Swiss-Prot record:
Bias (Pro residues): 330-347, 434-448
Compositionally skewed regions (Polar residues) per UniProt: 306-321, 386-395
Subunit field text: Component of the heterotrimeric velvet complex composed of LAE1, VEA1 and VEL2; VEA1 acting as a bridging protein between LAE1 and VEL2.
Keyword annotations from UniProtKB, A to Z: Cytoplasm, Nucleus, Sporulation, Transcription, Transcription regulation
Family: Belongs to the velvet family. VeA subfamily.
Record localization: Nucleus; Cytoplasm
Entry's free-text remark on domains: The C-terminal PEST domain is a region rich in proline, glutamic acid, serine and threonine residues that is required for the light-dependent regulation of development and secondary metabolism.
Disulfide bonds: none
Record's protein name: Developmental and secondary metabolism regulator VEA1
Region annotation (Disordered) ranges: 1-22, 238-547
Boundaries of every Velvet domain copy: 26-235
Organism: Ajellomyces capsulatus
C-alpha cells in the first residue's frame, strides 16, 4: 500500500482550487471551486454494443461547489456575490489516469472511443443547502475500462455584463448590438466563453463487472441536493455486496450463500386432531348417545387388573392424510360369534393388509363376548359406518403400498381401531366363524333400548349360509391372536347382492335415490337389476373398496381397492376378480 500511495501524485489543485482576476472597474473577483463529494468507485461498462444498456454510474455522484467573492485590490472587504453575480457557469469533466504513465518511444495508438461516457457537462444550480452557493452535480458519469482514475473539472464562464470583463480584454456586447448589420460579412464573435480554473478529484477505482462491490447507500449530501429539485438517484437500501474471502474462487460477483439451505418456513406439521368430532359429523344425522354401558362380570369376561379410561361419547374420525396412524380414541370391539358350521381347512383370506383409517364406531347394541377381545368399554353409538365421503383416500391395488412393521401382540390386542361393531354389517354378510361357548341367556337379554333405524336387524339375527350361496370361509383358529384378521373379516370379505333392498345402512334414508353413487356405481331400486346380471351395492360394503364393472367380453369383474398386512407379511390381493354371472343373486370375490 505504501508503494501504491507513493506512486500517486497529489497535484496542488486536488479537491479545491482558487483563482482571481481584475475587472474593468478595478474590482477583484475570486473563484473558489471545491469538490465536496468525491467519487469512490465505479463499474467498467465496456465498449461493446451493450455497454450503454448496462452502465453503472460513478458512485457517489461527484458534487462541486462554486463560490464567487468580490473585493478590492488589497483583498479587503471581501464579499460573497455568488447569487448576485450575473453570469453563466458550466463545468466540464474529463478523465485522467491517477498514476503517471511513462510514454515509450513507440507512439501508441489513441483509443478509438473515449473512456469517459455519460453526461460530462453540468450547469450550475443555486441551492440554499448545505450552504448558499452554486453546485455542479454529475449523476451520470461512467467509465468504460477498469483502472485507477481521477476526474478533472473545468470551469467555464459566459459573462453578461461589460463591467465584469477582464481589464484590457474583450468586452462583451450588449443585447442591442448583437444584431449584425451586414449578415453576409464574416465578423468576430460577440459572446465569449472564458476558461476560469480546473480542480481535480481524488483517485477512485473502476472495477470490472466481476469485482465490483456494488452501489452504496446514497449519502446525506445527495439526499439534500435531491430534496431541492436536482436529479440525483437516491438509493435507500444498501446494495453493497458482502464480500468474503473465497480461496478457491476468484469470481467476485458470487452471492454469499452457502451449501446450507436457507431457513425458509417449511410445511407446518399437522397438529393433533381434537378429541371431539363435532365439526366432522353431521349434528342432525345422529341423536345424542345414551350413557355408556359399563362392563360387568355378568356380561362376560372382565379384566379387573387393567382399568382404562372410558373413551369419549363421540369418537373422532381419523384424518385422511395420516395413513396408518393410530388414533388416540378407542373404537368398538369385534362382533360376537354366531352359530355356523365348522370351517373347512385353513383358508388364507386375501383381504388382509392395509389398515384403513376410516373410523368405525360402535352401534347401540352391547354384546358380552366383546370383553373376550378387549378390556375397553364400548363407546356410545353414533354411526354404524363412518361417512364414506370422509373416509380415507381410495387405494388403487396397482400402487405399491409401503410395508409396515408387525404390531406386537399387546398392541394388537389393545388397539381399538382394529375392531368393528356388529351393527355396521348386514346379517347376510357375516363370515363363517366357529361357535364359541354360548353365553347365558341373562347376558344377552339386557340391551340398550336406543335404536336409530327401525329396519336395522338385531345383531343376534344372522342368516346361515345356504347351499345356493357362495361363501368364502376363513380359518379363524387364531382369531384371538390375529386382531387384524378379525378387523378385516368384520369389514366384509365377500359381496352379497340383496334383492329386496329393504336392509340398508342406517345412515341412509329409506329411499334408494338418496344413496350416494361413487366410482361408477349405479342405483339399485329393486331386485330386477340383479336378475339381469347387474350387481348392486352391498348394504354394508364400502363404496371405495370394491368396484364392479363389465369387461368387453361380457364378464362382470370386481376390483379390490385395498391391500393390508397380516403379521408383518404383505398379502397380495388380486386386481381383477371375475364374478359369477350365472348367479347374480350372490357374488363372491373369489381367488
Amino acid at each position: 500500500m505504501a508503494t501504491k500511495a507513493s506512486s500517486i501524485l497529489h497535484p496542488p489543485n486536488e479537491t479545491e482550487h482558487t483563482m482571481s482576476r481584475i475587472t474593468q472597474e478595478g474590482k477583484k473577483l475570486t473563484y473558489n471551486l471545491k469538490v465536496i463529494q468525491q467519487p469512490e468507485r465505479a463499474r467498467a461498462c465496456g465498449a461493446g454494443a451493450k455497454s450503454s444498456a448496462d452502465r453503472r454510474p460513478v458512485d457517489p455522484p461527484p458534487v462541486v461547489e462554486l463560490r464567487v467573492f468580490e473585493s478590492d485590490l488589497n483583498d479587503q472587504h471581501k464579499t460573497d456575490i455568488t447569487f448576485s453575480y450575473n453570469a453563466n457557469f458550466f463545468l466540464f469533466a474529463t478523465l485522467e489516469w491517477a498514476r503517471p504513465i511513462a510514454h515509450g518511444r513507440v507512439q501508441t495508438q489513441t483509443p478509438s472511443c473515449p473512456v469517459l461516457t455519460g453526461v460530462p457537462v453540468a450547469g450550475i444550480a443555486y441551492l440554499d443547502r448545505p450552504t448558499q452557493a452554486g453546485y455542479f452535480i454529475f449523476p451520470d458519469l461512467s467509465v468504460r475500462h477498469e483502472g485507477l482514475y481521477r476526474l478533472n473539472f473545468n470551469l467555464y464562464e459566459e459573462m453578461k455584463e461589460p463591467k465584469h470583463a477582464d481589464k484590457g480584454g474583450l468586452v462583451p456586447h450588449s443585447q442591442n448590438h448583437m444584431a449584425p448589420l451586414t449578415p453576409s460579412k464574416p465578423r468576430s464573435p460577440h459572446q465569449f466563453l472564458h476558461f476560469r480554473l480546473v480542480v481535480k478529484s481524488v483517485p477512485f477505482t473502476v472495477y470490472s463487472a466481476k469485482k465490483f462491490p456494488g452501489l452504496a447507500e446514497s449519502t446525506s449530501l445527495s439526499r439534500i441536493v435531491a430534496e431541492q429539485g436536482c436529479r440525483v438517484r437516491i438509493r435507500r437500501d444498501v446494495r453493497m455486496r458482502r464480500r468474503e474471502p473465497k480461496p478457491n474462487k476468484d469470481y467476485g460477483a458470487y452471492d454469499d450463500r452457502r451449501i446450507t439451505p436457507d431457513p425458509y418456513p417449511g410445511t407446518p406439521v399437522e397438529r393433533p386432531r381434537s378429541a371431539s368430532n363435532a365439526s366432522m359429523d353431521d349434528p342432525y344425522r345422529y341423536p345424542t348417545g345414551p350413557p355408556q354401558v359399563q362392563p360387568s362380570p355378568d356380561y362376560g369376561y372382565h379384566h379387573p387388573s387393567h382399568q382404562q379410561p372410558s373413551p369419549n361419547l363421540a369418537a373422532t374420525p381419523q384424518s385422511h392424510l395420516s395413513f396408518g396412524a393410530a388414533p388416540p380414541q378407542y373404537h368398538a370391539p369385534p362382533p360376537p360369534p354366531t352359530a355356523h358350521p365348522a370351517p373347512p381347512p385353513a383358508y388364507t383370506s386375501p383381504h388382509l393388509g392395509y389398515t384403513h383409517t376410516r373410523q368405525l364406531s360402535a352401534g347401540p347394541e352391547y354384546d358380552p363376548h366383546r370383553q373376550k377381545y378387549t378390556q375397553y368399554p364400548p363407546p356410545s353409538p353414533h354411526s354404524d359406518i363412518y361417512d364414506q365421503s370422509k373416509s380415507s383416500l381410495p387405494m388403487n391395488p396397482s400402487v405399491d403400498h409401503p410395508s409396515y412393521p408387525p404390531m406386537p401382540y399387546e398392541q394388537r390386542m389393545s388397539d381399538p381401531k382394529l375392531y368393528a361393531p356388529p351393527s355396521q354389517l348386514h346379517p347376510t354378510q357375516q363370515y363363517q366363524q366357529p361357535t364359541p361357548p354360548p353365553p347365558p341367556p341373562a347376558a344377552i337379554a339386557p340391551h340398550p333400548p336406543h335404536q336409530r333405524t327401525p329396519t336395522k336387524p338385531s345383531p343376534s339375527t344372522f342368516f346361515p349360509p345356504t347351499p345356493s350361496r357362495l361363501s368364502v370361509e376363513v380359518d379363524s383358529s387364531n382369531e384371538a391372536d390375529d386382531a387384524i384378521l378379525n378387523a378385516i373379516r368384520t369389514r366384509r370379505g365377500y359381496i352379497l347382492d340383496e334383492k329386496s333392498g329393504a336392509t340398508k345402512r342406517s345412515r341412509d334414508s329409506s329411499d334408494h335415490d338418496l344413496k350416494p353413487l361413487r366410482n361408477g356405481q349405479r342405483p339399485v331400486v329393486s331386485g330386477d337389476e340383479a336378475a339381469k346380471g347387474e350387481i348392486g351395492e352391498t348394504s354394508g360394503g364400502s363404496d371405495d373398496e370394491i368396484m364392479t364393472y363389465r369387461r368387453a367380453d361380457g364378464r362382470l369383474v370386481a376390483k379390490q381397492r385395498v391391500s393390508v398386512h397380516s403379521k408383518g407379511k404383505e398379502v397380495n390381493i388380486p386386481r381383477d376378480v371375475d364374478l359369477l354371472p350365472r348367479r347374480p343373486e350372490v357374488c363372491a370375490v373369489a381367488e
